[in-house]
UniProtKB/Swiss-Prot annotation:
Keyword Nuclease: no
NCBIfam families on file: nuoB_fam, PRK06411.1
Source species of the chain: Adiantum capillus-veneris
Family the entry assigns: Belongs to the complex I 20 kDa subunit family.
Entry binding sites for [4Fe-4S] cluster: C67, C68, C132, C163
Keywords, in A-Z order: 4Fe-4S, Chloroplast, Iron, Iron-sulfur, Membrane, Metal-binding, NAD, NADP, Plastid, Plastoquinone, Quinone, Thylakoid, Translocase, Transport
Role of this protein: NDH shuttles electrons from NAD(P)H:plastoquinone, via FMN and iron-sulfur (Fe-S) centers, to quinones in the photosynthetic chain and possibly in a chloroplast respiratory chain. The immediate electron acceptor for the enzyme in this species is believed to be plastoquinone. Couples the redox reaction to proton translocation, and thus conserves the redox energy in a proton gradient.
Note on how the cofactor is bound: Binds 1 [4Fe-4S] cluster.
GO CC aspect terms: chloroplast thylakoid membrane; respiratory chain complex I
Oligomer and partners: NDH is composed of at least 16 different subunits, 5 of which are encoded in the nucleus.
Domain of life the protein comes from: Eukaryota
Protein's gene: ndhK
Name the UniProt record assigns to this protein: NAD(P)H-quinone oxidoreductase subunit K, chloroplastic
Cofactors named for this entry: [4Fe-4S] cluster
Amino acid sequence: MVLTSDHLDKKNIRKIEYKGEDSFSNSMSKLPLQGGMSDSIFMASISDFSNWSRLSSLWPLLYGTSCCFIEFASLIGSRFDFDRYGLVPRSSPRQADLIVTAGTITMKMAPSLIRLYEQMPEPKYVIAMGACTITGGMFSTDSYSTVRGVDKLIPVDIYLPGCPPKPEAIMDAVTKLRKKIARNRFVNRASRPIRTKYFSISHQLNLVPGTCAGKYNWDRENCGTKLAPANFSENCQKFANEHDELKSAI
């Protein structure tokens, strides 16, 4: 996006093609030229300049709740070095524009996740990492405390399946997110609607009788006959009378 002396060469003017605002490219050879311009200025629209600066400096908020976060932690090392993508992990949601949810989301953690997402400034992006985050994973069938998909709580931009995803797949997801940010338009970007908080929704629970609860219910209803027989009170009174007679005789 920076003009250099090579672009101002008259021989290269015919080779340069103009690229509209609907698409974005980091290449410096796709910009229109005007005579007499300096080689130290930017030639870009507001949308392209905003997207270029944002995709080059994503600040993620790491939200790891399970084993998938171990794979993301390996990106910090020298082997993958995610600093070359401009990723700077932040501990405060007010300083982050990307949240990476890695692991199982439980019912108790759902309000905290939504609160963190709402504290992030716009524009903000979400990467759902791992099968447990996307669909609930192995807990999606018979778990009473697992949220079956983080997209039921917050909007998701990139889905990254796997159990767990490899670090290479995580970098590919970051690359795809950068391409998505590059295609956004600043003037037409609509703010996401304010949704009802998760912890304020009244759940509609349907009680279903269990198939193996018959014996338990029968034992519960008849436990009085086993522990307290019908003549239990009479035996207690008889024992008390015998104790009083024995005490008076002594």
